[in-house]
Amino acid sequence: MDKKVTEVVEAFAQPIVEELNLELVDVEYVKEGQDWFLRVFIDSEKGVDIEECGAVSERLSEALDKEDPIPHLYFLDVSSPGAERPLKKEKDFQQAVGKQVAIKTYEPIDGEKMFEGKLLSYDGTTITLLLTIKTRKKEIQISMDKVANARLAVTF
C-alpha cells in the first residue's frame, strides 16, 4: 500500500465526509493484478446508504481529478467498512469495548499472533481481551505497540 497516496486522499476526503456528517474510517490504495484500487470507507452512527457513498464518491472524484495527486489510473470505491470494521483510531477501540474483536500482533504472545475475544477494556496503551479457549476463559493484555491490526469480529 502506498502510504503517501492514502495520506493525500485522507486530506481530500476528510472535509468532504465531515460536511456530510459522516466519518472517514479508512483509506486503502492497493494494486490487484494490473489495476489500482482506491478504497475509501465511510460510516456514521446510523450506518451509511448507497446515496451517501455516491455523494462522497462524486465529490471526492471531482476533487482528486482537479488536483490529480495519484500517479496511476485507479478505480475509486466508496463503501461502508462492513460488519468486521477495522479498529484504527482510539475512538474505534473505545466504541468496541464489550464487543467481539480479532487482533493480530506483530510478534507471538504465548506462541500466538491471532486472538479473538471480547474486548474488556482499552486505556490508550493496552487492550484487555477475554478469550474463550474450549470451555475455559482467559484474560490477556496486549500492548498497542504490538498490535498489527484489529477489527470487529462477527460471531454466530
UniProtKB/Swiss-Prot annotation:
A Pfam family that this protein carries is RimP_N
Question: Which coarse location class describes where this protein primarily resides?
Answer: cytoplasm
Which locations, inside or outside the cell, does it occupy?
A: Cytoplasm
> Could you give a single Gene Ontology term from the biological process aspect?
translation
Q: Which UniProt keywords apply?
A: Cytoplasm, Ribosome biogenesis
Task: Spell out the Gene3D superfamilies in the cross-references.
Answer: Ribosome maturation factor RimP, C-terminal domain (2.30.30.180), RimP-like superfamily, N-terminal (3.30.300.70)
The organism's superkingdom is given as Bacteria
* GO cellular component term, pick one: cytosol
Q: Which PANTHER family match?
A: RIBOSOME MATURATION FACTOR RIMP
What does this chain do? Required for maturation of 30S ribosomal subunits.
Entry's family note:
Belongs to the RimP family.
NCBIfam families from the entry? PRK00092.1-2
Write down what this protein is called. Ribosome maturation factor RimP
| Organism (species) | Bacillus cereus (strain ATCC 14579 / DSM 31 / CCUG 7414 / JCM 2152 / NBRC 15305 / NCIMB 9373 / NCTC 2599 / NRRL B-3711)
